[in-house]
C-alpha cells in the first residue's frame, strides 16, 4: 500500500464520507466531506484529494488535501451522509437534521433543507423544551432516516417539510446508529446492546425483530450492512469487539471477534469488495480486516504486516441455508478456515480515530488529533 497521507486541519473530525461516484463511472474517488465536533465553531467541509502522490519540488510526496469549501454547522456533527452527489445530510448534537447543497460552479455550500426539531426529550411546544442529539442518519434517495438519543426514529423525504413517519418511543435507550436492510426495512443499534429491525410497511411502534448478545448489555455504537448479502450485518461497540450477525438466524451473533482495546466508533464493509472490512476506535487505531479465502497467497499485505485473528465463538448457524450458492466469508463456520488477516493502517496510535470511509481503492479517516488521513491505493 502506498503511504497514507496526513493533513492537520485544526479541528477535531467526527465524520468523513466520500462523495459517491456517478453510476457506471470509472473514476476513482476525488472528493470527500468532513464534519467536526468539540470545537468552538464546527464546520461541514468538502475536500479534494487532487493530484495525490505527485513528487513536489523537494522530491517528497505531496499529499495535501485541498479544502474546496466549508460552512458553519450548529452543534457537533454526529453523523454525515451524502444524499446524492450534490447534497449532504448532517446530524447535529442539537437534534437538528440539515441538508447542505454543494454548488460546484462557485465552490460553496448552502443550507438546502432543515428539520430543526427532529430529536428532542421534551416537545418543541413545551416550556421545558430540551433537544436531544441526532446520533445517526442513513439515506436512500428520496428517503432519509434519522435516529437519536431520544429513542425516536424519523423517516423524512427530501423536499417534504414534515416527517413522513415518526416512531416516537422506538427505544427506551439511546439509538446510536441506523442502516437500511432492504428499502422498507431499517436496522438500529442501541446503548443496551440490541439490534432492532423495523419495517416501515407495518403500522405501530414495535420492531419486527430484536437481536442481542445474551446477558450482554454492552452499548453498540456502529452498524454496517453487507453490500451484497443484506442479511449480514457487522456491529461494533463500547468493548471494541466486532460482531457479525445473520439476521435470518436466531437472535445471536454468528461470530464475535476480539478487536480494539476501546470503543469501536465505525465499521464499514468495502462497498465493492466486501470480504474486506474496516474499523476504527477510540484507542487510536484503524484496522483493515481481510476475510478473503486466499489470505495465504495474498500479494497485498500492508507495510506494518498483518496479524491473524481467530473467531472467539460461533453460534450454530451453519445448519440452515447452506445450499446457498454463495455463503459470505464472514459467516463461514469451518474452524480450519477461521483466519482473518488484520492490518493496522495508521503508522502510530494517537487520539481517537472517530470515522472512516472507503470507496474503490480510496480510504479516508478523521481523528481527535485534528488530522485527516487519506490513501488512494488500498489494495496495491
Curated annotation (Swiss-Prot):
WD repeat locations: 8-57, 72-110, 127-166, 170-208, 215-255, 259-299
Localization terms from the record: Chromosome, Centromere, Kinetochore; Nucleus, Nuclear pore complex
Residue numbers carrying N-acetylmethionine: 1
Coiled-coil spans in chain: none
Source organism, top-level taxon: Eukaryota
Pfam families registered for this protein in UniProt: WD40
Alphabetical list of InterPro entries matching this protein: WD40/YVTN_repeat-like_dom_sf, WD40_repeat_CS, WD40_repeat_dom_sf, WD40_rpt
Keywords of this entry: Acetylation, Cell cycle, Cell division, Centromere, Chromosome, Chromosome partition, Kinetochore, Mitosis, mRNA transport, Nuclear pore complex, Nucleus, Protein transport, Repeat, Translocation, Transport, WD repeat
GO biological process, one term: nucleocytoplasmic transport
One Gene Ontology term, aspect cellular component: nucleoplasm
Function of the protein: Component of the Nup107-160 subcomplex of the nuclear pore complex (NPC). The Nup107-160 subcomplex is required for the assembly of a functional NPC. The Nup107-160 subcomplex is also required for normal kinetochore microtubule attachment, mitotic progression and chromosome segregation.
Subunit and interaction comment: Component of the Nup107-160 subcomplex of the nuclear pore complex (NPC). The Nup107-160 subcomplex includes NUP160, NUP133, NUP107, NUP98, NUP85, NUP43, NUP37, SEH1 and SEC13.
Name assigned to this protein: Nucleoporin Nup43
Organism: Homo sapiens
Amino acid at each position: 500500500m502506498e503511504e497514507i497521507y496526513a493533513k492537520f486541519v485544526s479541528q477535531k473530525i467526527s465524520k468523513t464520507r466520500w462523495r459517491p461516484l456517478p453510476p457506471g463511472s470509472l473514476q476513482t474517488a476525488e472528493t470527500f466531506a468532513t464534519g467536526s465536533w468539540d470545537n468552538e465553531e464546527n464546520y461541514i467541509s468538502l475536500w479534494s484529494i487532487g493530484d495525490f502522490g505527485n513528487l513536489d519540488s523537494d522530491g517528497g510526496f505531496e499529499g495535501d488535501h485541498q479544502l474546496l469549501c466549508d460552512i458553519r454547522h450548529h452543534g457537533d456533527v454526529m453523523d454525515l451522509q451524502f444524499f446524492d452527489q450534490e447534497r449532504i445530510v448532517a446530524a447535529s448534537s442539537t437534534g437538528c437534521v440539515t441538508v447542505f447543497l454543494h454548488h460546484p460552479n462557485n465552490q460553496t455550500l448552502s443550507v438546502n433543507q432543515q428539520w430543526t426539531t427532529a430529536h428532542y426529550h421534551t416537545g418543541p411546544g413545551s416550556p421545558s423544551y430540551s433537544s436531544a442529539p441526532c446520533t445517526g442518519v442513513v439515506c436512500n434517495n428520496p428517503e432519509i432516516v434519522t435516529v437519536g438519543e431520544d429513542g425516536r426514529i424519523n423517516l423524512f423525504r427530501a423536499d417534504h417539510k414534515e416527517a413522513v413517519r415518526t416512531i416516537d418511543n422506538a427505544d427506551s435507550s439511546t439509538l446510536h446508529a441506523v442502516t437500511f436492510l432492504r428499502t422498507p426495512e431499517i436496522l438500529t443499534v442501541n446503548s443496551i446492546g440490541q439490534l432492532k429491525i423495523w419495517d416501515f410497511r407495518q403500522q405501530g411502534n414495535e420492531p419486527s425483530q430484536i437481536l442481542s448478545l445474551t446477558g450482554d448489555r454492552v452499548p453498540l455504537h456502529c452498524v454496517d450492512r453487507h453490500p451484497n448479502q443484506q442479511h449480514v450485518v457487522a456491529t461494533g461497540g463500547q468493548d471494541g469487539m466486532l460482531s457479525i450477525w445473520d439476521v435470518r438466524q436466531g437472535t445471536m451473533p454468528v461470530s464475535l471477534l476480539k478487536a480494539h482495546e476501546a470503543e469501536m466508533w465505525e465499521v464499514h464493509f468495502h462497498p465493492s469488495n466486501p470480504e474486506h472490512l474496516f474499523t476504527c476506535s477510540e484507542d487510536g487505531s484503524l484496522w483493515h480486516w481481510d476475510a478473503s479465502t486466499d489470505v495465504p497467497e495474498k500479494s497485498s499485505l500492508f507495510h506494518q504486516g498483518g496479524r491473524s485473528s481467530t473467531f472467539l465463538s460461533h453460534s450454530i448457524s451453519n445448519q440452515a441455508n447452506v445450499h446457498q450458492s454463495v455463503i459470505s466469508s464472514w459467516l463461514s463456520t469451518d474452524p480450519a478456515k477461521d483466519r482473518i488477516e488484520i492490518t493496522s493502517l495508521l503508522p502510530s496510535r494517537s487520539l481517537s480515530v472517530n470515522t472512516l470511509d472507503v470507496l474503490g481503492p480510496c480510504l479516508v479517516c478523521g481523528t481527535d488529533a485534528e488530522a485527516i488521513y487519506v490513501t488512494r491505493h488500498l489494495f496495491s
